[in-house]
Amino acid sequence: MGNIRTSFVKRLAKELIETHKGVFTTDFDQNKKLVMEYSTVSTKHLRNKIAGYVTRLVRLEQTQE
């Protein structure tokens, strides 16, 4: 069983994907840098949670296509 993400993490991740279509990939390390660039997240812990959720959403999107 995995961890449950807060609604803030989910909302911000979805907003980033919507506003920057095609930029995020399935690579977590690259997504970390992009989250730092496109958002105002102040802590490393929160940045990593958002980048991880973005990576998961991108992977799910690719498998559905």
From Swiss-Prot:
GO terms for molecular function: structural constituent of ribosome. Keywords: Ribonucleoprotein, Ribosomal protein. The keyword Ribosomal protein applies. The keyword Ribosomal protein applies. InterPro entries: Ribosomal_eS17 (IPR001210), Ribosomal_eS17_CS (IPR018273), Ribosomal_eS17_sf (IPR036401). SUPFAM superfamilies: Rps17e-like. It comes from the Archaea. GO terms for biological process: translation. Disulfide bonds: none annotated. GO terms for cellular component: cytosol; ribonucleoprotein complex; ribosome. NCBIfam families: PRK01151.1 (NF002242). Belongs to the eukaryotic ribosomal protein eS17 family. This is Small ribosomal subunit protein eS17.
